[in-house]
């Protein structure tokens, strides 16, 4: 039976790049994104229909989270990997924290903190020993960048509950991974009107993510572009 992963936010950017890499390695995938058309178009070339299960919806929505859990349960055999990649930036341009609309902040936290936590709660029963959970974070979670109070604080909260989960569930492999700046639509939205063509494509962060997913690294926080290659992490020669 192939390994099975659930990746949120897989219609573009890092989520899609990771989905492509895992599909190429023979993983069975359950993927989601807010836009149904974009999700199905993006995942059409990932592999046989039986190996890629697209479930469109918003991770901030409880009904959608239940749909994702039901999709995994219907496949049988449990879940080997859960990647919390979907996220919401918030207003663009990003407001100062003193002027941040609380209703917008609630939406950011619903997508970046509460949604992933609730999805984890729903999926833990089908994750066996050594299953992996990866929460995608940002340097804005640890650095006080002006204008990043909403998104950054939500990623800090995501990191903290992920690390607490790692302490509470030592039978699982739980990671926080910062992919670094990437040439994505979200990054462009964070810097409206600026040229971001010097940022690496999301694919540049995938090898490091695969090291975390397929290697033997201890749980913790990693930067995707600075982790060692997977064959070195596992001690297997290339």
List PLM regions with ranges.
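Active-site Tyr-X3-Lys motif and surrounding loop/helix of classical short-chain dehydrogenase/reductase
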Residues: 67-71, 93-99, 103-110
């Amino acid at each position: 039976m192939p390994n099975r992963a659930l990746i949120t936010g897989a219609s573009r950017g890092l989520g899609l790049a990771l989905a492509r890499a895992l599909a190429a390695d023979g993983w069975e995938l359950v993927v989601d994104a807010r836009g149904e058309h974009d999700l199905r178009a993006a995942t059409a070339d990932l592999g046989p229909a039986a190996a890629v299960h697209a479930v469109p919806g918003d991770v901030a929505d409880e009904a959608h989270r239940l749909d994702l859990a039901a999709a995994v349960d219907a496949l049988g055999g449990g879940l080997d990997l859960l990647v919390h990649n979907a996220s919401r930036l918030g207003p663009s341009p990003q407001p100062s924290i003193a002027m941040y609309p609380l209703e917008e902040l609630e939406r950011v936290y619903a997508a970046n903190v509460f949604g992933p936590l609730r999805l984890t709660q729903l999926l833990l029963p089908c994750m066996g020993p050594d299953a992996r959970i990866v929460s995608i974070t940002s340097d804005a979670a640890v650095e006080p960048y002006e204008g990043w109070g909403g998104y950054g604080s939500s990623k800090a909260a995501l990191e903290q509950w992920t690390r607490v989960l790692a302490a509470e569930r030592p039978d699982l492999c739980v990671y926080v991974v910062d992919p670094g700046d990437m040439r994505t639509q979200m990054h462009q939205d964070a810097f409206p009107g600026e040229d971001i063509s010097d940022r690496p494509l999301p694919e540049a962060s995938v090898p490091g993510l695969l090291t975390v997913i397929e290697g033997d690294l201890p749980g913790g926080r990693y930067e995707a572009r600075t982790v060692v290659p997977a064959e070195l992490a596992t001690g297997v020669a290339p």
